[in-house]
């Protein structure tokens, strides 16, 4: 089967949640089918991953963006009645290449990873499977609640515009995949016509070991991503001081690429270390006794929680971070929102090795049973094959005009 897959960023290296899922899906589909993977590169350093990615997926198409220009285009799109996100990820180069591929090659199905990429195939007669993962429009609404005007106005407006786009896009998609039942319910609240499927994120089950004995706490993630920045600022200001008073030798590791200036500033706090980008997070997990996910803004499944559970590090999370998970608080992880109670939960685990081991063991069993990549990817592949099987005329090349992703008409007004 011939599949065209489009991702909003190069899924390599797979070190953030969206890239991990896209990379796993692309690699799996490329093993059993003829896969063309198209994506946008908006960070020049990401080009270093092209050759490594090509070893897994030989057939690549990509278009580059310069962030300042893309942001200006996004804001202009918002001002003209469209979505900032859709306009931001519009690459003329990628649009032309996708159009040529659809014109010259007989694909059986299209797989979209992230909603902005829908614009590149608008008008195709091929079946389109849309893996939205999360409802991004609601994320913008959450951002707005944490900002002051005028930024809050921009975020709130983008949330409304993107929601309008999402509702229209799912009208002609064969199936829309969400990572959690909560995200599915949210999408159907404003797009009841959507044909949906819930497929959770998977996790790499290699590298499991007992939690460390030292008083080290870890948080991982892309540290220029606003929800992560807000989470570690909240933890350092409102939670870690109480932990450090109870356990003076406690350390807090903030592990992840592109730390913002605000995050780097946290590294000046006694007991707090900001690593920046690392080649492999597993060594940092192996020296950690507890993983925290103190997010106040969160969508879908937090990969950082699944990864910690898979590696045998017990987790303390907020209810926002835990919302997309089917595991049970108290049995597989601890959930607290009040800063004082969150600190107590962390301190309790730091002091009680038996409790750490018991919680980690139950959590590992849960992810083995519910989040293995093998099971997740089989379900994704089945939906793509079902879509191709229902398509009545997939033998002839399709035609999608370049304007589908590049013109003023239709590009930002679904």
Predicted features by range, described:
Residues 1-61, 103-105, 406, 413-414:
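N-terminal subdomain of nucleotide-sugar transferases
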Residues 171, 189, 193, 197-287:
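Conserved catalytic-core segment of nucleotide-activated headgroup transferases in glycan assembly
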Residues 174, 271, 286-300, 311-314:
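Acidic donor-binding loop of glycosyltransferase active sites
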Residues 304-307, 314-318:
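Short hydrophobic beta-strand element within catalytic cores of glycosyltransferases
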Residues 333-340, 348-354:
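Conserved acidic donor-binding segment of nucleotide-sugar-dependent glycosyltransferases
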């Amino acid at each position: 089967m011939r599949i065209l897959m489009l991702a909003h960023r190069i899924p390599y290296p797979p070190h953030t949640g969206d890239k991990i899922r896209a990379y796993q899906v692309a690699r799996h589909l490329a093993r059993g089918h003829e896969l063309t993977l198209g994506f946008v590169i908006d960070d020049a350093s990401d080009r270093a991953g092209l050759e490594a990615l090509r070893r897994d997926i030989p057939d690549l198409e990509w278009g580059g963006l310069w962030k300042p220009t893309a942001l200006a285009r996004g804001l202009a799109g918002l001002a003209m009645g469209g979505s900032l996100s859709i306009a931001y990820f519009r690459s003329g180069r990628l649009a032309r290449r996708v159009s040529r591929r659809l014109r010259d090659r007989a694909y059986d199905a299209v797989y979209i990873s992230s909603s902005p990429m829908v614009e590149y195939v608008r008008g195709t007669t091929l079946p389109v499977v849309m893996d939205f993962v999360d409802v991004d429009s609601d994320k913008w609404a959450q951002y707005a609640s944490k900002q002051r005007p005028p930024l809050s106005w921009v975020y709130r407006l983008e949330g409304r515009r993107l929601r309008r786009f999402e509702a229209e896009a799912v009208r002609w998609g064969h199936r829309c995949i969400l990572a959690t039942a909560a995200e599915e319910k949210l999408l159907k609240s404003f797009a009841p016509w959507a044909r949906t499927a819930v497929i959770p994120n998977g996790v790499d089950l290699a590298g499991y070991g007992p939690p460390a004995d030292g008083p080290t706490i870890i948080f991982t993630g892309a540290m220029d991503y606003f929800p992560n920045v807000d989470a570690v600022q909240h933890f350092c200001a409102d939670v870690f001081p109480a932990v450090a008073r109870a356990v003076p030798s406690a350390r807090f590791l903030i592990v992840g690429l592109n730390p913002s200036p605000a995050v780097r500033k946290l590294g000046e706090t006694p007991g707090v270390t900001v690593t920046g980008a690392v080649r492999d997070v597993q060594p940092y997990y192996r020296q950690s006794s507890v993983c925290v996910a103190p997010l106040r803004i969160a969508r879908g499944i937090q990969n950082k929680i699944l990864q910690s559970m898979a590696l045998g590090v017990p987790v303390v999370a907020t209810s926002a971070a835990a919302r997309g998970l089917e595991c049970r608080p108290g049995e597989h992880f601890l959930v607290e929102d009040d800063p004082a109670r969150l600190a107590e939960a962390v301190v309790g685990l730091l002091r009680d090795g038996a409790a750490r081991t018991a919680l980690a063991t139950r959590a590992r069993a849960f992810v083995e049973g519910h989040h293995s990549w093998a099971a997740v990817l089989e379900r994704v592949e089945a939906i793509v094959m079902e879509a191709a099987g229902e398509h009545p005329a997939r033998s002839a090349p399709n035609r999608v005009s370049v304007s589908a992703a590049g013109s003023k008409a239709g590009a930002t007004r679904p």
